[in-house]
A protein has these predicted regions:
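Sec-dependent bacterial lipoprotein signal peptides
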Residues: 1-19
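A structural "domain/chain start" motif
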Residues: 17-59, 63-66, 71-74, 119, ...
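Surface-exposed short loop/turn segments
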Residues: 23, 64-68, 74-75, 80-124, ...
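Conserved acidic
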Residues: 45, 49, 103, 145, ...
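Compositionally biased, intrinsically disordered linkers/stalks adjacent to structured regions
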Residues: 146-171
């Protein structure tokens, strides 16, 4: 019976050894956990894409939970961004059925983003490039399909921005 207890304890110890470096708390200091995200400037040809990306960045911060959304006067971190370009490319076409021909298109956007420490006024990340990608199907009314896909594109960019905010090296 003592051998079973010993083996059980040894098994638990071995399994928990892999978790020794895991932390339940964030590396972001408590006084740096407020964020403000103004509307991103949109230099692309896709209408309202700057608004969509900024809104999705806010949602991603809320979903992740480390940062609290704040006003510009009370925030510790401000995320400023510019949607600099978008592109649309055909990926795949199927000509087997001419009555219901569908085309897959890849929608890509590039954002330039800066992270500003509002307490010190220091730019922590200066003009980092983020590329978001998504795909959609369709032949007719590509502009509407592109606009509809912009939410998924914004999710991709937002996830990258929030990941970087969580991994900032704070002084």
């Amino acid at each position: 019976m003592n051998v079973l207890k010993y083996l059980f304890a040894l098994t638990i110890l071995g399994l928990s050894a892999g978790c020794a470096s895991y932390k339940w708390t964030s590396d972001v200091p408590e006084d740096k956990r407020t964020v403000f995200v103004p509307v991103f400037r949109n230099d692309s040809e896709v209408t309202e894409l700057g608004n969509v990306v900024a809104r999705q960045v806010l949602r991603e911060f809320q979903r992740e939970g480390t940062f609290k959304i704040s006003t510009p006067e009370n925030c510790a971190l401000e995320i400023q961004g510019i949607i600099s370009s978008t592109s649309l490319a055909r990926v795949n076409s199927s000509n087997r059925d001419y009555t219901n021909r569908r085309r897959e298109r890849r929608f890509t956007a590039e954002a330039t983003v800066s992270f500003i420490d509002k307490k010190s006024g220091k730019v922590i990340v200066n003009n980092r490039k983020y590329v978001g990608r998504t795909t959609f199907y369709g032949d007719k009314d590509v502009l509407t399909l592109q606009r509809n896909a912009s939410g998924r594109l914004a999710e991709d960019i937002a996830a990258q921005i929030v990941d970087d905010a969580l991994n900032l090296k704070w002084e």
